[in-house]
Design a protein with these regions (language model features):
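Short, intrinsically disordered/low-complexity patches at protein termini
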Residues: 89, 106, 157-159, 193, ...
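Conserved functional hotspot residues or short segments at active or partner-binding sites
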Residues: 177-378
């Protein structure tokens, strides 16, 4: 999507949103590749004079290392992307070979605890180069290792049932950032934290009993960090914190997180029927109260959005269009998301977020706006 802010000055008024559910690649040598598709989107964004960008990596579980290597270069230009150490201690540096950046504007990367593997490589590289502000959960998943499937059958006697022996996934390598730290256990830590739906749950490598430890190796020497974001961060954090305190949906998220953490900590449920019915009734009343309040508030937000934003759809089907169509979240979801009928869907009366912009995405857009303003003022 491209979001045009109708009240903002030129040079600060067009923000792109790039949603990446995975770093996909056609393993059979086909033409569908994440980096190739993203390049088309970014080229069209440049044509549309997009000033800043939100890259949404929430719940992106990873994918092709080659695709993330290529894609990182779109934002950093030529230079190292990730270091990979094998069991013998040999370090292989994977680099991008772009002569120049494809996108030069300020970037916010949205992450959560389910952003893992290749997502962490991209987020870490953009953070180490000083190209992006990382926003979301306190950190990503923390999967900094590489597994190789091994056919157990090849080690069995000749007359054994090899075809039914199965596969064993063996850890053979470990990822390291260009700055030297591993993404293992720690993941990529956010520059600005937001209360999110995944924050209440114990997710990540660090909760596993036998997870590999975090460690560091020698940083790459042939990369240069842009210090401008470091200088901006105090102002960005302060502005974001003020908005979060006033954002009703993010406050509801905070309340939900606190309630869920307490339930997990208590680790018990009453077996008394009346007690359980009362607990369920209390939760249901809270849900209904929140939804009722949201319906009225979302209607007002939708009216405000209509005067504040123009949202243009930008998919692979639109990259060569003469003019980009205006986005219609309901219609676009019907067209592009062909889902099996969900018999329980009608039981959920939670209203949809106005303009298809959830609270974290809205705050990501706000932070990009702040970055553009600070750049413009020279601070």
């Amino acid at each position: 999507e491209i979001i045009e802010l109708t009240g903002a000055p030129e040079g600060q008024n067009r923000i792109g949103v790039l949603s990446l559910p995975s770093f996909y690649a056609d393993m059979e040598g086909g033409d569908r590749r994440c980096a190739k598709d993203v390049k088309k989107i970014l080229e069209r964004m440049n044509k549309e004079n997009v000033d800043g960008l939100v890259i949404d990596l929430r719940s992106n579980g990873g994918g092709s290392l080659e695709e993330v290597r290529l894609m990182t270069g779109f934002f950093t230009g030529n230079g190292p992307v990730v270091q990979i150490k094998d069991t013998r201690g040999n370090v292989d540096i994977k680099s991008a070979h772009n002569r120049q950046k494809l996108f030069n504007g300020p970037i916010v990367v949205l992450i959560n605890k389910l952003s893992a593997s290749a997502s962490e490589i991209l987020a870490a590289a953009l953070q180490d180069y000083g190209r992006a502000v990382i926003v979301g959960d306190d950190s990503t998943f923390g999967k900094g290792s590489v597994q190789q499937p091994v056919d157990i059958g090849q080690y069995l006697p000749f007359f054994a049932a090899r075809d039914r022996a199965g596969l064993l996934k063996v850890t053979t390598q470990k990822f390291y950032r260009v700055a030297g730290g591993s993404t293992q256990l720690k993941g990529v830590e956010s520059d600005i934290q937001l209360p999110t739906a995944t924050a209440a749950f114990e997710l990540g490598e660090d909760i596993l009993d036998y997870a590999m430890p975090y460690d560091q190796i020698t940083p790459c020497t042939n990369y240069k960090k842009d210090s401008s974001i470091t200088a901006m961060l105090p102002a960005l954090k302060e502005a974001s914190a003020k908005r979060v305190e006033k954002d009703r949906d993010l406050q509801i998220a905070r309340e939900d997180i606190a309630m869920m953490k307490q339930r997990i900590k208590d680790n018990k449920l009453s077996l008394n029927k009346k007690t359980r019915e009362q607990e369920n009734s209390t939760l249901e009343e809270r849900r209904k109260s929140i939804n009722k309040e949201r319906k009225g508030r979302f209607a007002e937000m939708a009216k405000e959005d209509a005067t504040k934003y123009k949202i243009y759809r930008l998919t692979l089907d639109d990259v060569n269009a003469k003019e980009l169509p205006l986005a219609d979240p309901d219609k676009d979801n019907e067209q592009f998301m062909h889902l099996a009928e969900d018999p329980t869907a009608e039981l959920d009366d939670s209203p949809e977020y106005p303009s298809g912009l959830d609270p974290e995405l809205r705050e990501g857009i706000n932070i990009v706006q702040d970055m553009l303003k600070l750049e413009s003022s020279g601070k």
